[in-house]
């Protein structure tokens, strides 16, 4: 049975027509918002977090029908299959066991293997942090460069930045992902080879961007005096292909294993997170895992009606498939979470940006929304104008950290006030009559420019304090939200075939850029012209 033919889907279509013009400000009006208040009914705790869903364009019937949709689509069954280690990535014939990486149950899949690798990580991280692991001249390591791309970069970078306040002050962590040499060059300007450790992260150890940067970094070490025989003091590898790591020249003892049953965008919990562990220490890394496990338990045990990942996923479907929203915004009012929107871009769009159903037929409904964002309050001075007064409705996830992780505590009430005020303003709007009063006498023509449509939907996620544990829960919340949506849309969130075609053609174009001549029959006229212009520039 296809999504469009599910009874709950049909019921939601009728329900949408009934409430599509309902006003949030009316639902919050004192005469309508009696105890338990709307905020009380629609605030859901879970995994150490809480979500205020009350400023969404939903009522009790909406949630009831959305939960019915989740049941009819098989969300519970697919969730349980994932945790059990069943094949939930059918196009690659794999399980998706990122949850096993943070499981405490000794009977969880691959528990012994995971525990052994984490113990190896912890031993190494402690040696680097304590100064016992030194560079080739005997100096302690003060710089760690993580070289990877996609899931081998975005997750570790996001977490390391977010938890800077609990990181070692003695070690700086740098991230290089782009094949553009400027990325690596800027980092190399900041580091001393005698005090630098490189972590090369690639599942296959053949990724173009990662290996290009890794080779350039190796050459840099040698050019600055590091004997090739001493490179083992400065290079470690994280991969599912240890033979290729050794072939590159990294000592076999310096190889940390990742597995093909963990997708890249779900891999920060594995040895891919070695840079995180070195920065914050093994004990804090364990807390990060514990927070994710808190959310895993909530996802598995909470009824769907009070289940945070389920409700966030379903509300996203409500806007994407019924209201027709093209994008949704993540606005963390926390500079520590600066890289969370970038991380979620990959998590959401690489997972659910699909058109083929699990049975190989093509969907006739939208799937992943465009995910974007910027920390508050920066976004208010960039794109919030469009959110408030533009004709496009963009659902928003606000993320508010209630207590600061830094010493400048006097800033924090201003930050929180802006977050909460934005959600209120987006919900309330300003009518034309209200705008006339604001404009004042004799300024009738200004009033339309001072109106706000309002009724703009937002969710506010509350985090008591940004700790490794609450961050772990927050990340896992979004991971599971993605699974919920993929299940309803009947797509596979664990593959990413969409990145392959560009890679294949990229190798052809790269060869043409250095060839003596280019066969115009190999490419369309536009691509051929671009290649010819680049060839001319590269010869200068």
From Swiss-Prot:
InterPro entries: G6P_Isomerase, G6P_Isomerase_C, Phosphoglucose_isomerase_CS, SIS_dom_sf, SIS_PGI_1, SIS_PGI_2. One of its GO terms (biological process) is gluconeogenesis. Keywords: Cytoplasm, Gluconeogenesis, Glycolysis, Isomerase. It is found in: Cytoplasm. It comes from the Bacteria. Pathway: Carbohydrate biosynthesis; gluconeogenesis; Carbohydrate degradation; glycolysis; D-glyceraldehyde 3-phosphate and glycerone phosphate from D-glucose: step 2/4. Its EC number is 5.3.1.9. Catalyzes the reversible isomerization of glucose-6-phosphate to fructose-6-phosphate. PANTHER family: GLUCOSE-6-PHOSPHATE ISOMERASE. This is Glucose-6-phosphate isomerase. It comes from Burkholderia ambifaria (strain MC40-6).
């Amino acid at each position: 049975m296809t999504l469009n033919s599910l009874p709950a889907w049909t019921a939601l279509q009728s329900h949408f027509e009934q409430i599509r013009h309902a006003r949030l400000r009316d639902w919050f009006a004192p005469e309508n918002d009696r105890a338990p208040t709307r905020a009380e009914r629609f605030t859901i705790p879970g995994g150490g977090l809480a979500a205020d869903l009350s400023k969404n364009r939903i009522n009790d019937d909406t949630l009831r029908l959305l939960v019915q949709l989740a049941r009819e689509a098989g969300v519970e069954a697919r969730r349980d299959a994932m945790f059990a280690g069943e094949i939930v990535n059918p196009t690659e014939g794999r399980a998706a066991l990122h949850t096993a990486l943070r499981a405490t149950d000794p009977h969880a899949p691959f528990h012994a293997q995971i525990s052994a690798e984490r113990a190896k990580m912890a031993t190494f991280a402690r040696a680097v942090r304590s100064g016992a692991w030194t560079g080739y001249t005997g100096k302690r390591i003060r710089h760690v460069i993580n070289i990877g791309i996609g899931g081998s970069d975005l997750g570790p970078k996001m977490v390391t930045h977010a938890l800077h306040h609990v990181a070692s002050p003695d070690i700086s962590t740098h991230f290089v992902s782009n094949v553009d040499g400027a990325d690596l060059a800027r980092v190399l300007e900041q580091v001393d080879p005698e005090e630098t450790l490189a972590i090369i992260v690639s599942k296959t150890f053949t990724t173009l961007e990662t290996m290009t940067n890794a080779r350039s970094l190796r050459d840099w070490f040698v050019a600055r005096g590091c004997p090739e025989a001493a490179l083992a003091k400065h290079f470690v590898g994280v991969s599912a292909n240890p033979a290729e790591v050794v072939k590159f020249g990294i000592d076999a003892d310096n190889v940390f294993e990742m597995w093909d049953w963990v997708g890249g965008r779900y891999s920060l919990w594995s040895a891919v997170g070695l840079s995180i562990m070195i920065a914050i220490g093994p004990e804090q890394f364990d807390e990060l895992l514990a927070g994710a496990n808190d959310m895993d338990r909530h996802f598995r045990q909470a009824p769907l009606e009070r289940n945070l990942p389920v409700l966030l996923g379903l509300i996203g479907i409500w806007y994407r498939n019924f209201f027709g929203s093209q994008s949704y915004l993540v606005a963390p009012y926390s500079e520590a979470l600066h890289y969370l929107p970038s991380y979620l871009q990959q998590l959401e769009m690489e997972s659910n940006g699909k058109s083929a159903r699990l049975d190989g037929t093509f969907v006739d409904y939208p799937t992943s929304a465009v995910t974007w964002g910027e920390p508050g309050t920066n976004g208010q001075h960039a794109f919030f104008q469009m959110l408030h007064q533009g004709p496009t409705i963009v659902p928003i996830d606000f993320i508010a950290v209630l207590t600061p992780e830094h010493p400048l505590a006097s800033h924090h009430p201003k930050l929180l006030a802006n977050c909460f005020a934005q959600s209120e303003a987006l919900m309330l709007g300003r009518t034309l009559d209200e705008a006339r009063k604001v404009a004042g006498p004799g300024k009738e023509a200004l009033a339309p420019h001072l109106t706000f449509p309002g009724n703009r939907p937002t969710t506010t996620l509350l985090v008591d304090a940004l700790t490794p544990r609450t961050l772990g829960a927050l990340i896992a919340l979004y991971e599971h939200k993605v699974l919920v949506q993929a299940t309803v849309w009947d797509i596979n969130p664990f593959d990413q075939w969409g990145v392959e075609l560009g890679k294949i053609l990229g190798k052809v174009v790269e060869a043409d850029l250095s060839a003596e001549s280019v066969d115009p029959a190999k490419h369309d006229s536009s691509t051929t012209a671009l290649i010819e212009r680049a060839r001319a520039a590269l010869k200068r």
